[in-house]
Amino acid sequence: MSNNKQAWTGQLDLSVFNNGKKSVARDVFFEKALKVMRPVYLNQSDIPTFYIVNVGGGYLDGDRYTMNFNIDSDAKVILTSQGATKIYKTLNDHVEQYQTFNIKNNGYAEYVGDPIIAFENAKFYQHNVFNLESTASLFYTDILTPGYSKSDKRFSYTYMHLLNEIYVDDALVTFDNMLLDPQKQNVDGLGYMEDYTHLGSCYFIHPSVNQKFIEQVYEEIKHFQHKYDCRFGITHLPTHGFSLRILSNKTQVIESIITAVQCYVVKQIFDRDVDFLRKY
């Protein structure tokens, strides 16, 4: 699986810069199955929110997607999807998606997408590359859920493969290679899904993040493990950041935990409230 020259099912490129008053888009390009809506500035914020849309309604066998986001120095952007990413059955091929985030010093990208739903016989590969300069910041989330299965299997998709590479000043600081392959692995077992079906992931990188801050984040969310049937852990990355992994049987539980983390870090680091991303 490689990001070589090929006919893309959907392609999107977005660049954001700070014009001295607010962050605005400099270059926006999209074609075929991918589209980005005009930015909105929620609650009179100086940060644009972009909604990314798959006009086809779902990912089909053989689809290939690429998205590139460039955030200039001192620019900030919020990115989200307009709905769940649905991966339908891929009997002959598979689906690939590539996302690249280039964030310059004092730039910030906040990506909170809707769940990725893999239906029966789906094969999905996603490769994310995050290139951050030393004072750049990132908040990124993914939620993986199994779709409807005629046979009522807990994991009816063929595989879901997510690869994340994070670079800070061109040095690789995180290589997260996650493969869920029910045909070859006991994904229900220890070290994988541990009797849960839904998986949430979150990365937060900022120069202010240290072990004490990570412990404070954990204190903010630890009550969720008593309130809901879920399990999670926070890991200090080999840089100024952390990753959060959540296991549950419900998307809403994972979303609640991620939102709590997002609200806490955004308030503590940027002194702002999280805007509700209205989707209809």
Curated annotation (Swiss-Prot):
Function text: Required for maturation of urease via the functional incorporation of the urease nickel metallocenter.
Question: Which molecular function GO terms apply here?
Answer: nickel cation binding
| Organism name | Staphylococcus saprophyticus subsp. saprophyticus (strain ATCC 15305 / DSM 20229 / NCIMB 8711 / NCTC 7292 / S-41)
* Sorted UniProt keywords: Chaperone, Cytoplasm, Nickel insertion
The subunit field of the Swiss-Prot or TrEMBL record says: UreD, UreF and UreG form a complex that acts as a GTP-hydrolysis-dependent molecular chaperone, activating the urease apoprotein by helping to assemble the nickel containing metallocenter of UreC. The UreE protein probably delivers the nickel.
Report the GO terms under cellular component.
cytoplasm
Name of the gene encoding the protein in the UniProt record: ureD
Member of which family? Belongs to the UreD family.
InterPro entries per UniProt = UreD (IPR002669)
What is the protein name given in its UniProt record?
A: Urease accessory protein UreD
Q: Where in the cell is it found?
A: Cytoplasm
Q: Which HAMAP family is this protein grouped with? A: UreD
The record lists its disulfide bonds as none
Tell me the domain of life.
Bacteria
Primary location class: cytoplasm
